[in-house]
Amino acid sequence: NSNFILARVPLRRFEDLDTSSLNSIEVISSDSEELEEAILSIIDSIRHDHPTVHPGDIAVVFLEGSKANYALADSLAVRIYEKYSWKAIKGYETKDSTSDAVFISNRNNIKGLEFPFVIGLVRGQITDNVFSRNTIYMMLTRSFITSYFLVNNMDANAEFIKKYTIAAKSISDSGIMILREPPEAEKSQQNQKVSIAVAQEQRPLKEVIEE
């Protein structure tokens, strides 16, 4: 089978910023009980590496709409203020992002927005569901400097974390990602999965593709 080579042109949003030395995607795994601390650790790293960063340069986006994630958002907003004296706003409560507040959101309120740094959080198991994968892609493409992909390190995610870590390193090192072209039987199976997922969501396929 042949391979697909996906390439990207590095974005230069700031003339004085050399993005060649920055990782465009970093994959980080954490225990579910330590996700909040992991997010704060990432913010610490951003502040250390970019001393002029503003609160509004950072977005935290969670994949699942679970009670645990909304509770995390509430707690995180308090911790951010206590630790950095920064405000935080929640995208599902207000549509306005601002330069003086960290933007915390679920997946439904991030489309069309861009930030220098995005922390994407997946608390549960990552499946091959087309909508889940599509949302992960959307989260990771909201940043124009670095996306931090924070994943629960449960055993069920081990293979996914391994593959994404390798892919992220390839993108950061060379700007390309090499993908195996699946055989026809696998393509057919994937098409069936997409069709079933779309039917269950009762949404047009075109809408899913353009999401």
Description of each model-found segment:
Residues 1-211:
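The feature marks helicase ATPase cores and/or their adjacent C-terminal helical subdomains
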